[in-house]
From Swiss-Prot:
Belongs to the protein kinase superfamily. CMGC Ser/Thr protein kinase family. MNB/DYRK subfamily. This is Dual specificity tyrosine-phosphorylation-regulated kinase mbk-1. The lineage of its organism: Eukaryota, Metazoa, Ecdysozoa, Nematoda, Chromadorea. It comes from Caenorhabditis elegans. GO terms for molecular function: ATP binding; protein serine kinase activity; protein serine/threonine kinase activity; protein serine/threonine/tyrosine kinase activity; protein tyrosine kinase activity; transcription coactivator activity. Signal peptide: none annotated.
Length: 882
């Protein structure tokens, strides 16, 4: 019999505290065995002594062993029964297991009629196992040592369950020793059940304790007779169930990134623990739902100690005080967005109502709000008088981890205004007022000292100061950036997204000009101009109206392949979508802007026919402005400087601002050169609408002169420092009258005669266009008059002669209009034209020096030539030298 099969307590039975040699000798005497030779542990001899004394001792030991076994079985069965009785109230994993009917050897319980594989660590100074003994008889000591090293530290014996107790002879049924064979961890019942069922039981326990906590809170609130929770809104502690069983305190204060509790949870059952009669409840960590429930307070929010909701927005309470001065006036916000929410408050120090923008309690929104604060402080510092229609930032602070921005309180936005009109649009006069203010705003933002890109210009971000007036403010600089510090590629709302952003090309302040053009059309028509449902649909809607984008943009666009395909010849065409909806779109440019605006039909849908301020002339100017704003190429797109001087926006009683604020230090670093006032003998160089052509101005609208060449014109300008500057007139041009002064230092190298011919030819072309527009308007008026006359005749039965006489008078008025136009053409071709021009220039220069020049508009309807406008046109003539 191998001593390794004897239980540890039996091996140590009868031993006294002495040396190892004496213990071995006493053991040999007790079992009537020869002493163990420590020099050769593999030597074994048969027992030939009487077993009478040993049998008596073995019987007593067997009785004690059975008693201990029964006690151990009772304790474990009791422990299992207690665990099963606490099944709904604990996180202890349960698994089916038969009652224990065998002893515990090396912390493994053997079941009846079941063979198990025992793994024991190698013990020193004891006899070898049966397998080892079978390998060593007759071997020299050297081979035995080598074989012993090959066996390793572990050995396995397969024995029948229930056998192995002392006094029961048996023959080993073990197979030959298999070296380094370990038990598969997946066969272990505890580990297998833990890995498979931990998620299931975790979810069951979370749901159970959550419902239990809700019921307990409901009972507490009913017993107290008031709403649950305290007034301070601090996180309520867990119930007694959590406080008893949760022995690990929660120290993490991060409410945004919670970890799963089972990742750091201790083992639920310790199979190697000694038997005990006391039930040990294992320690548990809080799960996500339990932690949220622990933090829930009377305010109803699971985050930020109950002050936030699930979207990380602050939970507003009427009467709450922010920053010791702002009193919240409502529980509901006046506006919400991806950034957070806006609420109405009362400033107790300044005795006024304000709007507080509460940013979400997330790091990304917090960082972006800091950029918004920086840009607003920069704009407010350069616009202290608030002339450029940007919302005023009154202050900012942090309240319970939320960054709060305090603004002036404003009224409705432009989208609300459209809803009030049932999406029929506002009048052209009101759209003109909005365009004037927004043009000044973009002129201010694009100045060299700021170079701010709003990046989210839309009707929702343009608010009225007063509901009864047309004054506006531009808000929401949360997505804004500066030209040299672009952060995002995915910007702008889809309806107002520019082509360069859709194509992934680098963008600048011109993207806001595209958005402004879309806004103006929507404000008048009542519907978005490009209402795309996706980026692909958005690009196709743009192509329907404006045609295909320039090839130069498509060649460099990283996202061009998303919208267009390319032939072998390098020609782009619209890409067929996955759904096969290519035929639902019209051909490029088939949807005319002329028809959308209703230039000749009395506005969109004919709703403005006959109304004052909605003539064909007004719509023609409006269409020209929109076309310049909606140019594909940002370089060809009209700049804010020209927008505020466009004939659609210029009014007789208004004076156009001279120039945006600028410093001379960064003058040459910008795309547009802003030159200072005449005191420094400098002028302004602006970009022309296109490259390689000579353009002249017609009431603020720049048209290509017939027969103009693409050769650049060398222009020289004198400075105080004596520096000379050569400007390519193919891309830039001098515009003296737009600065309200004339600089006599310009010297043009092109012959005067050629320029004068170009100027005269341009004037003829302009007059022809004006005549056509006037004739169209007269025809519409005549049609209206005829309809009115027919109605009157039907009601009053007037004689036919009266209507014919009226038609005769109207027919006589038409040649009179033509005579006036012919007189104007003859006047411009008069031989004394240059003499009159010099006289006018002298008078205008005197007005310019006194800053009293105010250009007037040309009345195209009646064909009258205004003298002041004529003076303005002559100032644009480059041959004038005062």
């Amino acid at each position: 019999m191998n001593t390794a099969d004897v239980p540890d307590n039996l091996q140590s039975w009868g031993q006294q505290p002495s040396s190892s040699y004496s213990n071995t000798q006493q053991h040999s005497q007790m079992t009537n065995l020869p002493p163990i030779n420590h020099n050769n542990l593999c030597d074994t001899e048969p027992m030939n002594e009487d077993f009478q004394l040993q049998d008596v001792q073995a019987d007593e030991l067997q009785k004690q062993q059975k008693q201990q076994e029964q006690q151990h079985i009772q304790q474990q069965n009791a422990q299992r029964f207690i665990a099963q009785s606490r099944q709904p109230h604990s996180n202890i994993l349960r698994f089916p297991q038969p009652p224990i009917t065998s002893i515990k050897t090396n912390s493994h319980a053997f079941y009846p009629q079941q063979e198990v594989t025992q793994v024991r660590p190698k013990k020193h100074r004891v006899s070898m196992t049966n397998a080892e003994a079978a390998l060593t008889p007759g071997m020299p000591p050297e081979k035995q040592a080598a074989k012993k090293r090959n066996i390793g530290q572990f050995s396995t014996d397969t024995v029948p369950a229930g056998i192995g107790m002392i006094g029961i002879p048996f023959e080993s049924t073990s197979k030959p020793l298999q070296i380094q064979q370990f038990r598969n961890p997946q066969d272990a019942p505890v580990r297998k059940l833990t890995s498979d069922l931990i998620k299931t039981y975790k979810a069951i326990n979370e749901s159970f304790y959550l419902r239990k906590q809700v019921r307990r809170d409901r009972h507490k609130s009913q017993d107290a007779g008031k709403p649950k929770g305290s007034k301070d809104g601090s996180g309520a502690s867990l119930t007694d169930t959590f406080s008893i069983h949760n022995a690990i305190p929660i120290t993490s204060s991060d409410n945004h990134y919670q970890q799963d509790a089972h990742q750091n949870a201790p083992p639920l059952l310790d199979t190697n623990a000694p038997p005990t009669s006391t039930m040990v409840v294992p320690m548990r960590t809080e799960t996500d739902l339990q932690q949220q429930q622990r933090q829930k307070s009377s305010r109803g929010g699971p985050y930020n100690n109950g002050y936030d909701d699930q979207n990380y927005d602050y939970i507003l309470k009427n009467g709450e005080i922010f920053d010791k001065r702002y009193v919240i006036l409502s529980d509901t916000p006046v506006g919400k967005g991806s950034f957070g929410q806006v609420t109405k408050a009362y400033d107790t120090l300044n005795k006024e109502e304000v709007a507080i923008k509460i940013i979400k309690n997330k790091k990304t929104f917090f960082d972006q709000a800091q950029i918004e604060i920086h840009l607003l402080e920069l704009t407010n510092a350069h616009d202290k008088d608030n002339k450029y229609n940007i919302v005023t930032l009154k202050g900012h602070f942090v309240h319970r981890a939320h960054l709060c921005l305090v603004f002036e309180l404003l009224s409705y936005n432009l989208y609300d205004l459209l809803k009030n009109t049932s999406f029929r649009g506002v009048s052209l006069n009101l759209a003109r007022k909005f365009a004037q203010q927004l043009g000044k705003t973009l002129l201010f933002l694009s100045s060299p000292e700021l170079s701010i890109i709003h990046c989210d210009l839309k009707p929702e971000n343009v608010l009225l100061v007063n509901a009864k007036r047309s004054q506006i403010r531009v808000i929401d600089f949360g997505s804004s950036c500066q030209t040299g510090h672009r952060i995002y590629q995915y910007i702008q709302s889809r309806f107002y997204r520019s082509p360069e952003v859709l194509l992934g090309i680098a963008y600048d302040t011109k993207i806001d000009m595209w958005s402004l053009g879309c806004i103006l059309v929507e404000m008048h028509t009542g519907e978005p101009l490009f209402a795309g449902s996706s980026e692909v649909d958005q690009m196709m809607k743009i192509v329907e109206v404006l045609g295909m984008p320039p090839k130069e943009m498509l060649d460099i666009g990283p996202k061009t392949h998303k919208y267009f395909d390319k032939t072998e010849d390098g020609i782009y065409y619209c890409k067929k979508t996955r759904d096969g909806y290519r035929h639902t779109y019209k051909a490029p440019g088939a949807r005319k802007l002329h028809e959308i605006l209703g230039v000749t039909s009395g506005g969109p849908g004919g709703r403005r026919l006959g109304e004052p301020g909605h003539s064909v002339e007004d719509y023609s100017k409006f269409k020209d402005l929109i076309k310049r704003m909606l140019q594909f190429d940002p370089k060809q797109r009209i700049s804010p400087y020209y927008v505020v001087r466009h004939p659609f926006l210029k009014q007789k009683e208004e004076r156009v601002p001279s120039q945006p604020p600028v410093s001379h230090s960064n003058l040459q670093q910008q795309q547009q050169l802003y030159i200072q006032q005449p005191s420094s003998q400098m002028s302004q160089v602006m970009e022309s609408p296109s490259v390689g052509s000579v353009y002249v101005e017609d009431n603020g609208m720049y048209r290509q002169a017939p027969g103009s060449s693409a050769n650049p014109i060398s222009v020289t300008s004198s400075f105080d420092e004596g520096d000379a500057m050569e400007v390519d007139a193919g891309r830039r041009r001098f515009s003296a009258h737009q600065q309200n002064y004339h600089n006599p230092n310009y010297q043009y190298s092109q012959p005067q005669q050629q320029q004068q011919q170009q100027y005269q030819q341009t004037q003829r072309t302009q007059l022809e266009q004006q005549q056509k527009q006037a004739q169209l308007q007269q025809q519409l008026q005549q049609q209206q008059m005829q309809q009115q006359q027919q109605q009157q005749q039907q009601r009053q039965h007037m004689p036919q002669a009266q209507s014919s006489s009226q038609q005769h008078l109207q027919s006589r008025a038409r040649p009179r209009q033509q005579d006036q136009n012919e007189w104007r053409n003859q006047f411009e071709l008069d031989d004394t034209f240059q003499q009159k021009q010099r006289k006018v220039d002298d008078s205008v220069s005197n007005q310019i020096s006194r800053n009293q020049f105010n250009p007037q508009q040309v009345s195209m309807t009646h064909g009258n030539v205004n003298a002041n406008n004529r003076e303005m046109e002559k100032l644009d003539y480059p041959n004038n030298k005062l």
